[in-house]
Swiss-Prot record:
InterPro entries: ATPase_NBD (IPR043129), Chaperone_DnaK (IPR012725), Heat_shock_70_CS (IPR018181), HSP70_peptide-bd_sf (IPR029047), Hsp_70_fam (IPR013126). The modification Phosphothreonine is found at T198. Gene3D superfamilies: 3.30.420.40, Actin, Chain A, domain 4 (3.90.640.10), Substrate Binding Domain Of DNAk, Chain A, domain 1 (2.60.34.10). Acts as a chaperone. Residues 634-665 are annotated as: Disordered. Signal peptide: none annotated. PANTHER family: HEAT SHOCK PROTEIN 70KDA (PTHR19375). Coiled coil: none annotated. This is Chaperone protein dnaK1. It comes from Prochlorococcus marinus subsp. pastoris (strain CCMP1986 / NIES-2087 / MED4). The gene is dnaK1. GO terms for molecular function: ATP binding; ATP-dependent protein folding chaperone; unfolded protein binding. Keywords: ATP-binding, Chaperone, Nucleotide-binding, Phosphoprotein, Stress response. Belongs to the heat shock protein 70 family.
Amino acid sequence: MGQIVGIDLGTTNSVVGVIEAGRPVVIANSEGTRTTPSIVGFTKNSEIVIGDQARRQLVLNPKNTFYNLKRFIGRDWDELDETSISVPYNVKSNDKGSVRILSPFTEREYAPEELISSIIRKLINDAETYLGDTIDSAVITVPAYFNESQRQATKDSAVLAGIKVDRILNEPTAAALAYGFEKSSSNNVLVFDLGGGTFDVSLLRISNGVFDVKATCGDTQLGGNNFDSKIVDWIAERFLEKHKIDLRRDRQALQRLTEAAEKAKCELSGLQKTKISLPFITTSDDGPLHIEEEFDRKLFESLSDDLLDRLLEPVQIALEDSGWDAEQIDEVVLVGGSTRIPMVQQLVKTLVPNEPCQSVNPDEVVAIGAAIQSGIISGDLRDLLLNDVTPLSLGLETIGGLMKVLIPRNTPIPVRQSDVFSTSESNQSSVVVQVRQGERPLASENKSLGKFRLSGIPPAPRGIPQVQVAFDIDANGLLEVSATDRTTGRKQTVSISGGSNLNEQEINMMIAEAKSKSTEDRIKRSVIDRKNNALTLIAQAERRLRDASLEFGPYGAERQQRAVELAIQDVEEFIDDDDPQELEISVSSLQEALFGLNRRFAAEKKVDSNPLQGIKNTFGSLKDELFSDDYWDDDPWDNQMNSNSRNSRYGNSRDDDPWDNDYFL
């Protein structure tokens, strides 16, 4: 049986680690370095090169050398923004709307997962050489804010590389495992993970080998590459102003600018100023042109102000979700090479009073954590327990376009949640389960993860069939949804493994937008709820009228039936109007009319059990004719009177109104 390793699959660099003699070890690659550039390229002979070899041909062969591939994984073409496709190589959409990367040398199109699998395969080969043994499985890390499709696509890349994924592990959680390994103290830890292409922040409670994730937040469109782009744009704009040439339109020049920007960024972590020198960057009618620019830390910080602002919000959201104050944080762990930027470190110090931990290598700590998790799985490490969470809320679309959340964000995983829903129309033979991910109350403003149809539901009035919908998230954060018709036992299941994915900008703004538009959302929801409640009441009233016709005949309760019919007409008249007050009045009138009809039903039941009751009913009817406006004030449709258990089969009960519109599909 082969060994298991831990892999940090990064946007910029990747690292592989393993447990040896009970301790995590980072494995050097075949070139002798401990980090492998996440770059894949092809030579003129169509030979594939990976890592440092691919990096060396970036400038001379930009169209056949591919980096930042992690930004494409698990995403469709229409979800990419201008920043993602601003690369020197060709990125396009195929006829299915999927991202494809073109190599002129091989004359082939590649899926991002296929190219990333080459990086994984190199890491595995180097590890097998070091260990002298085969490797058949791995723990692979992903950003905490990766969605379901991105996680599944990462898993698919590993399968293409020929290995099994035993666990998809969130990067901040892996870093916390590395930090807390062999520590017996209890600490509240904030992991600040700013990598090359993504940003995550997680809050954990670490105590005696138990790693309990409390909250996570992030931005999958923010990383060190964004800081590089600020420098690239500054250089390019100055050159454009001087020479009227935009270097960003030249693939080779753009690659040289990007490398120079990254170098300047790194140098400014230890120096106050640096020089950017790019001879023969391009040519004009007057001859070759060069770049010679002074660039200092103060200018870099002024260019990056907006990026620092974007780092603040996820930290604040994570603190709010965890219920902790900044003063309760005992340790701050910095992860990712971009946390070496002085202004980033200074920002962290303003957020949390404690000095950041300097005892871990930000480039290797995630791989070490992945190796520790691999040791837990293999049994080489014991007495360690990891409790992770799901980063975004998961639910489904219900009648009126509302989002019904089944699993809220920051719920510990693995988890299973279920609820019972019903049909929104009479004799409805099927229901569509539309799975959504996000924080907005309106389903259309959350991201669709997939949908499926449960058919074969026996004909029945609206609200009678019972459909059990269950959401299952495994330890990898991968989702499976099932729907079961309780009457027939018919079941339909779908694993969320592709299709629609979260747009990076949507993820970045999702929680913040939900908060900023909470008032607008409440108004929209109240309008939908009023309309749905009115439709439900009409359905109840029509069913009660049919019962009355069977019980009393056409004239037995004529006055009460006529009152209900007129009240239904009033509700139908105002249901699509923009005047909520008129609708509320008409609904109230229908409730009163139904109450009168129900009183007549109750009176008839008493007649059946007591012959003298008929005399009382006669006087009661006379009273109704003379004092028809004097109805009781009790609400016959009080939600508390109609509570029932929805989910007793699954060990949790609900006290909600059984006609609550959240439960119609």
